[in-house]
């Protein structure tokens, strides 16, 4: 530890102690909050099923930065490089299309064995795994419908895919000793004016009930469902709306997924957390950055990211909220994208843990809104960066932008050689 860092750390401890904050306790709490990194940033949501296939489902990864991962080995190597530069506990979030098999596997036939390499890798790297059925980029999703499809056979295919995915998820949890959160998102919807909005939702309701009918150990597997406002090609009607999934998660007591980009541009999920927690047992968060639509830009340390973190910490939701990331930017170095976004999420959590929440609550309850605003703003100037740098030091990761040198070296030595 450098003398400069030691001095900054000691000063930070004193400054935060003056407002009633124990920085050591804050760092201990931060180590209780893993962030689930999404594998699909590494290859632009391509997966390993069909290298020539295109991304569908009303989502887009824009850009053509060189060096994207082309197979599981490259993707795991890239993830390891990113994770070395991110302090503290992490998880990995996988989609079903990232299976590994020597022969083609139909999505309704995926099995735990197709993900055993991921599990062994997770064990070696002390990671938990999360999972998602992939209800997009497939011939049977080409018309824009999956679990709500009017064709019984197509709908059953997707039901069977989700049921098979739940078994994979439970396998993750059993093998790794930490529950896998499996999130169901479907792209189902219509481009233009929709006459019958009820029937697809009735079919989706019945399909989801069949999907979750098999009882699985909650210590191994957690079901989550995710809404969306619209997607490309589904601008006028989305079957799985916020109201649909809020009702479903409440009535079935599944987890509810809130994606930062899946609502109207003037809505924020930070305001939805406390409301949803009154009705659902657990929340899954997909922290993202929507720019005018669900563009999935890299997460910044901005007001909304901070507000999300603050909601988790202020209400002590550590055991009820699962923090995941969801962005995919193909216009910049993909490893850097992971590092920037994940470090920013962790910085926001740390800043929330360094807030004198008890004092702010007292001021609010007393109606002293002047002091509340003053303290909230003064808090931003306290030396949280020194605490962050100590956290990085203790986890043997770069504290500042030094991590970028490692990414550039990896790009030169590894990524530049990929076709």
From Swiss-Prot:
Q: Does the keyword Signal apply?
A: no
Q: What is its EC number?
A: 5.3.1.14
Q: Where in the cell is it found?
A: Cytoplasm
Q: Which GO terms describe its biological process?
A: L-lyxose metabolic process; rhamnose catabolic process
Sequence similarity: Belongs to the rhamnose isomerase family.
Stored HAMAP family: RhaA
Q: How does it assemble?
A: Homotetramer.
Protein name per its UniProtKB record: L-rhamnose isomerase
Gene for this chain:
rhaA
